[in-house]
C-alpha cells in the first residue's frame, strides 16, 4: 500500500489480513499490488506482481449489493471491434472505450458474448468499471426448444469447460462482479450443471443466465428487451431476485426515445437495478467508397452476397465505429448521470442537489448555472456550494448570485422564455475524465414562451351566412365567402380556403402571395420515416396503413364565435377504425388555429 509492505504470508496456500483496507468499487477503484514470489533451493526463481482489489458482492433482499450498497447498473454490452483492426483491438482503443464510458456515465459492461482480451479486465480494475463476465457459449442457431444444445448430455462437457476457462482465468479481477454462463443457448440440464460447477468453484459472486427465466438456476433475473409494463409487474411481485436486464434499450439508428421511462422505473423500484444497453459500438469497418472515394464504414452486403448478410444489423451502437458519439449517446448520458438538481426555487435561488453515487462525494465537480432568454445567453453564475455532499444524500443550496441573475432576467425579458441550465463539470482529477467535461446537466424553464393566444372554442352555435360573400356577424373585419365547394375566410393580410368536399385547407395566402397552392391540401400526417429499430420489428409493414389511410368526410359544419369563425370537418377512417375531427379557428387577426381529435376503437387492432 502506497509503496510499503503491509502484510506477508508464505507457503502454497496462505491467508493475509490487511488492516484498514480501502475497498474497490467502480466509483473508487482502489487497487493494491501483491507480489507472489516462487523460491527454490537456489533462491528466488520467479516474482509475479498482481494488482488486487478488495470488495464484496452479495444478494440480499432482492438486491445486488457491492460492499453492502445496492448499486445501479448503468451498463452496456461491448463487442471487441475496431474499425481498422477488426477483432484485433489495441490497448489504446480499450482505454478510449473506457474514457467514453466515463463520459457517458456508463459504469458497467457485459462482455458479450465471450471472454475479452485479458488486458480489458486489467483496465476495468484500474479505472473502475463493473463487469459481467460472459463465457463463450452461444448456440442461437439451434433454437431454444427441443434442439437446444443445452438439453443434450453429449454437450455438457463443452458447456462446463468454457465456463471453467472463463472463471479460472479471470477470477482475481475485482471488477468482475457477476459471471454469465452464456448467451441465447436455450435452457436445459447442461446449464443447470454448469451453474452448479461455477457456484462450487467461486462462492463470492452471483451467477446469471438469461434464457432460463426467473425460475431457472440464475441468481439474477436478467431477461432481455422486456417492456415497461412487464418490468413494473415483476418489480411489484414477490420475486426475490434482483432485476437487471442483460440487454435492453436497443441503440440502433435513431433510438433511445424511451430510455427515460426505463430509468423512471429503475429509480422507483429497489429490486430494479438497471441493465446493459445493446450495444456500445457500431461494428463497422473503415473503408473508402468505390464511387466517391470518401471514408465510409462497411458492413453486411458490402462484402458480397455470400455469406448471407444481415445488412446493417451489427451497427446498433451508442457510438460510431470510430468512437464518435451517435446522437442518442447524449440521451443515455443524461439519464445515467449521477447528480441531480431538485426542487428549484427560482425566487430565492434555492435548490437541492442529490448525489446518486454510492461510494463517493461530488467534490470533483464544479457547478455553474447559465441563464438564457429565448436561447440567448444572458449570464453564468458560479455555484461553489457543492462540496461535502455524501453519497446517496441531498443538500439544500442557496445562491444569492443565482437569485439576482434570475430576477434580472425576468425583469428585462419577462415576455420571453427564460431557462436556467445547470452543468456539473469535472475538475479533471478523476482518471480519463477531462477537465471541463460536463458529467451532469439539467434545464429548468423559469418563464415559458408566451405564444399569441388564438380563440379555439370547444363548441359553438351554428350561424347562417347569407349570400356567397359577407361579413362575420360579430366582427366586420372577417370576410367569409361560401360556394358549394369551399369556404374562404379572409382577415387582415391572410385568406384561407377550406374545401367542403375535402375538409382540408386547400389554399392559403398572405398579402396575396400563395403559401399553399390549390390541390396542395394541408392534410394530417400519421406517418414518420421508419427507424432501424422499426425495420428490425417489421413495423413499417405492420403499420403501413397509417402512411396514407382512407379518410371519408362525414360532415362539414361552420359556427361563429366572438371575433372568430370555426369550421369543423369530421372524418371516418375505416381502415384504422377511427374517427377524426379537424377544427379550424380563424380570428380577426388573420390567425389560423388547427386542432385535431382522434377517437379510436380500443377493441380493434
Spans of model-derived segments:
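Secreted/periplasmic carbohydrate-active enzymes, especially glycoside hydrolases
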Residues: 1-118, 123, 128-131, 162, ...
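Substrate-binding/catalytic cleft of secreted carbohydrate-active enzymes
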Residues: 98-104, 108-318, 327
Amino acid at each position: 500500500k502506497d509503496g510499503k509492505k503491509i502484510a506477508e504470508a508464505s507457503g502454497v496456500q496462505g491467508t493475509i489480513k490487511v488492516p484498514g483496507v480501502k475497498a474497490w468499487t467502480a466509483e473508487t477503484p482502489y487497487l493494491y499490488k501483491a507480489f507472489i514470489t516462487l523460491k527454490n533451493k537456489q533462491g528466488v526463481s520467479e516474482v509475479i506482481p498482481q494488482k488486487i482489489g478488495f470488495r464484496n458482492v452479495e444478494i440480499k433482499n432482492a438486491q445486488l449489493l457491492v460492499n453492502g450498497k445496492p448499486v445501479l447498473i448503468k451498463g452496456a454490452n461491448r463487442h471487441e471491434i475496431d474499425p481498422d483492426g477488426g477483432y484485433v483491438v489495441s490497448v489504446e482503443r480499450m482505454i478510449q472505450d473506457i474514457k467514453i464510458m466515463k463520459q457517458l456515465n456508463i459504469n458497467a459492461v457485459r462482455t458479450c458474448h465471450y471472454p475479452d482480451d485479458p488486458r480489458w479486465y486489467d483496465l476495468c480494475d484500474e479505472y473502475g468499471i463493473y463487469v459481467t463476465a460472459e463465457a463463450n457459449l452461444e448456440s442461437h442457431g439451434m433454437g431454444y426448444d427441443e434442439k437446444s444444445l443445452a438439453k443434450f448430455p453429449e454437450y455438457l462437457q463443452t458447456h462446463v469447460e468454457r465456463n471453467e476457462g472463463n472463471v479460472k482465468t479471470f477470477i482475481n479481477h475485482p471488477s468482475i462482479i457477476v459471471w454469465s454462463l452464456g448467451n441465447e443457448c436455450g435452457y436445459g440440464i447442461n446449464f443447470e450443471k454448469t451453474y452448479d460447477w461455477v457456484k462450487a468453484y467461486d462462492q463470492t459472486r452471483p451467477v446469471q443466465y438469461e434464457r432460463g427465466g426467473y425460475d431457472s438456476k440464475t441468481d439474477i433475473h436478467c431477461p432481455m428487451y422486456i417492456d415497461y409494463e412487464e418490468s413494473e409487474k415483476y418489480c411489484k411481485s414477490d420475486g426475490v431476485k434482483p432485476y437487471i436486464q442483460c440487454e435492453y434499450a436497443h441503440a440502433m439508428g435513431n433510438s433511445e426515445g424511451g430510455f427515460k421511462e426505463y430509468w423512471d422505473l429503475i429509480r422507483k423500484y429497489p429490486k430494479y437495478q438497471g441493465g446493459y444497453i445493446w450495444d456500445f459500438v457500431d461494428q463497422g469497418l473503415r473503408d473508402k467508397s468505390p464511387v466517391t472515394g470518401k471514408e465510409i464504414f462497411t458492413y453486411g452486403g458490402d462484402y458480397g452476397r455470400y455469406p448471407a448478410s444481415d445488412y446493417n444489423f451489427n451497427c446498433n451502437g451508442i457510438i460510431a465505429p470510430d468512437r464518435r458519439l451517435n446522437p442518442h449517446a447524449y440521451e443515455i448520458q443524461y439519464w445515467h448521470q449521477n447528480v441531480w438538481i431538485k426542487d428549484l426555487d427560482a425566487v430565492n435561488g434555492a435548490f437541492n442537489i442529490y448525489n446518486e453515487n454510492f461510494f463517493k462525494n461530488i467534490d470533483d465537480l464544479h457547478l455553474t448555472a447559465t441563464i438564457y432568454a429565448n436561447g440567448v445567453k444572458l449570464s453564468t453564475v458560479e455555484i461553489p456550494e457543492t462540496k461535502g455532499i455524501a453519497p446517496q444524500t441531498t443538500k439544500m443550496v442557496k445562491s444569492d448570485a443565482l437569485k439576482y441573475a434570475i430576477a434580472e432576467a425576468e425583469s428585462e425579458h419577462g415576455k420571453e422564455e427564460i431557462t436556467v441550465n445547470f452543468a456539473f463539470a469535472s475538475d479533471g482529477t478523476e482518471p480519463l475524465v477531462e477537465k471541463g467535461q460536463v458529467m451532469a446537466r439539467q434545464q429548468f424553464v423559469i418563464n415559458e414562451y408566451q405564444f399569441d393566444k388564438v380563440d379555439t372554442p370547444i363548441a359553438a352555435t351554428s350561424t347562417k351566412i347569407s349570400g356567397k360573400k359577407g361579413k362575420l356577424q360579430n366582427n366586420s373585419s372577417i370576410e367569409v365567402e361560401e360556394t358549394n365547394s369551399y369556404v374562404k375566410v379572409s382577415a387582415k393580410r391572410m385568406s384561407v380556403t377550406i374545401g367542403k368536399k375535402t375538409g382540408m385547407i386547400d389554399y392559403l395566402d398572405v398579402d396575396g402571395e400563395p403559401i399553399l397552392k390549390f390541390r396542395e391540401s394541408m392534410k394530417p400526417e400519421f406517418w414518420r420515416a421508419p427507424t432501424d429499430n422499426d425495420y428490425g420489428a417489421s413495423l413499417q409493414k405492420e403499420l403501413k396503413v397509417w402512411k396514407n389511410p382512407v379518410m371519408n368526410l362525414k360532415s362539414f359544419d361552420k359556427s361563429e364565435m366572438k371575433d372568430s369563425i370555426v369550421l369543423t370537418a369530421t372524418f371516418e377512417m375505416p381502415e384504422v377504425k377511427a374517427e377524426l375531427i379537424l377544427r379550424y379557428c380563424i380570428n380577426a387577426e388573420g390567425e389560423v388555429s388547427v386542432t385535431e381529435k382522434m377517437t379510436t376503437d380500443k377493441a380493434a387492432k
